[in-house]
Regions:
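N-terminal edge beta-strand
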Residues: 84-110, 230-245, 373-399
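Hydrophobic or amphipathic alpha-helical targeting/insertion segments
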Residues: 153, 157-194
């Protein structure tokens, strides 16, 4: 199967101008937005963790746990160059963790300590950012806060895992180059109380191939404006259709992350009943069904999938706008259904409803805008590029409303480090698909979003657009959350 090549007429034709400044009751696997410290939230009794066995998550090679002690997961990651054969059996140089793209699947239980011995065998500095994890800012992988790992050097990341969910890891130095070259991987934190079902992992990416090469080091005008959109679709580092066996009459949990530099994607499932049960890893009190699930850059969706009675195959497909108002479908996984058991009802996941937001005691505003043309585009927050920015200073453990206003007429998948938030409203509307806790949200052209958070995790935290070229060109700032 040849790699899918995307038709970009829709995005290329966009003229960007810059303006001035009866569902089942689910079960809990991640904390609600309460007053608990993140290092305490969601932890389980150590005996329970010790007795629990990590589920098998199919689709990705797992990292080797070097420590068999209960409550500790210890792995090694090495960033280096490697080669893959994505085009005509020719070698393409990539950057890889442990020689593979994506990197190995890291798994642990909520409450475990994760210890990662990282070695940088690249010829430039790098870090590892743990996207979505509420950990210490000293382990967050941001170079303004901790020193990057220099070529030939090593560093050990170590932290407790306060929250269950689907997360991922990637560098935070020249991120647009490093992620495009292949430095990315999934991290799954399990709650022993979760319903035991078959789990599958899908890391969805697109890369811009120039013949047999990837060369993200320079940005033309289109990449500066829209971000780097690829012409080859990868799922779990493969260009071919993934296949597996799926049992009839059973539910599965599919964990999906969009690790692309810039492309918003949608996903859908064929020959199955399916619904979204978690966003950014956190289980929803009320899962929802949609025709296609929106998956912005950096975000994660967990799907519950049940094969239809009599189905011979179940498929996952990525859907992309076709430039005419419709969608083109790209099949990426085909599961052959075995057995003849009848389809069950929906699983009761048991996530509790979130507590009602308390009255806001402080507010922050993030205005997203850009200016320039040709090959000198700047993307800004509150009229400032990163490095010349004014941090947002906020008190920890305080009900907070953060307003995000997009003045650029472009879309921005916006990510907050170190915190969870919920979407109060989008352009004055409360939408079912905006439910739950998350760390990333898609802000579309001219959107006005209000986010609610209680800032449970003190520290210096990045807030930025996850279109990696936008971030590289300035659309980053800091939130200083003080005790």
């Amino acid at each position: 199967m040849s790699p899918p090549v995307f038709r970009l007429a829709g995005s290329a034709a966009l003229s960007l101008s810059f303006a001035a400044c009866s569902e089942p009751e689910p079960r809990k696997s991640t904390p609600s937005e309460t007053h608990a410290e993140p290092t305490d939230s969601g932890q389980v009794d150590s005996g329970e963790v010790a007795d629990a066995v990590l589920p098998v998550v199919e689709g990705l090679a797992p990292a080797l746990d070097l420590d068999d002690s209960p409550g500790v997961v210890e792995v090694e990651l090495v960033a280096s160059t490697a080669t893959v054969s994505w085009v005509d059996d020719s070698d393409t140089e990539v950057w890889a963790y442990n020689g593979q793209v994506p990197g190995p699947l890291i798994q642990a239980h909520v409450g475990d300590t994760l210890r990662v011995h990282f070695t940088n065998d690249l010829d430039e500095p790098t870090t590892i950012h743990w996207h979505g994890l509420r950990i210490s800012d000293q382990m967050d992988g941001v170079p303004a806060i901790q020193d990057p790992v220099e070529p030939g050097e090593s560093f050990t990341y170590e932290f407790a895992l306060p929250d269950a969910g689907t997360f991922w890891y990637h560098p935070h130095v020249r991120t647009n180059v490093a992620v495009e070259m292949g430095l990315q991987g999934m991290l799954v934190v399990h709650d022993p109380a979760d319903v035991a079902v078959t789990e599958r992992a899908f890391v969805v990416d697109d890369v811009l191939m120039q013949g047999t090469r990837i060369d993200p080091r320079t940005m033309d005008h289109m990449s500066q404006v829209h971000g780097r959109h690829g012409n080859m679709l990868l799922v779990n580092g493969e260009t071919d259709l993934l296949t597996a066996t799926v049992r009839a009459g059973t539910a599965e949990r599919w964990r999906i992350v969009n690790t692309a530099n810039a492309r918003t994607m949608w996903v859908s499932v064929t020959n199955a009943s399916w619904r979204v049960i978690a966003v950014d890893g956190t289980l929803l009190h009320t899962p929802f069904e949609v025709e296609r699930g929106l998956l912005p850059v950096g975000q994660r969706l967990d799907l519950e999938v049940i094969p239809l009675d009599g189905a011979e195959t179940v498929g996952l497909q990525v859907e992309l706008p076709d430039g005419t108002g419709g969608f083109s479908e790209y099949p990426v996984f085909a599961g052959t259904v075995e057995g003849d058991q009848a389809a069950p009802g929906w699983t009761e996941w048991g996530a509790p409803a979130l507590a009602e937001p308390r009255e806001s005691l402080q507010e922050g505003t993030l205005l997203l805008n850009g200016e320039g043309g040709g090959t000198s585009v700047e993307w800004m927050i509150n009229g400032e590029v990163y490095g010349e920015h004014t941090p947002l200073e906020l008190d920890a453990h305080t009900p907070t409303v953060i307003t995000i206003k997009d003045r650029s007429r472009a879309e921005h998948p916006f990510h907050l480090h170190g915190q969870f938030f919920r979407i109060l409203d989008r352009n004055g509307e409360v939408l079912p698909e905006d439910a739950g806790l998350r760390d990333t949200v898609l802000v579309e052209g001219s959107d006005l979003l209000r986010l609610y958070t209680e800032l449970e995790n003190p520290g210096r935290w990045m807030a930025h657009c996850h279109i990696l070229e936008h971030a590289e060109l300035g659309m980053m700032t800091e939130m200083i959350v003080s005790e």
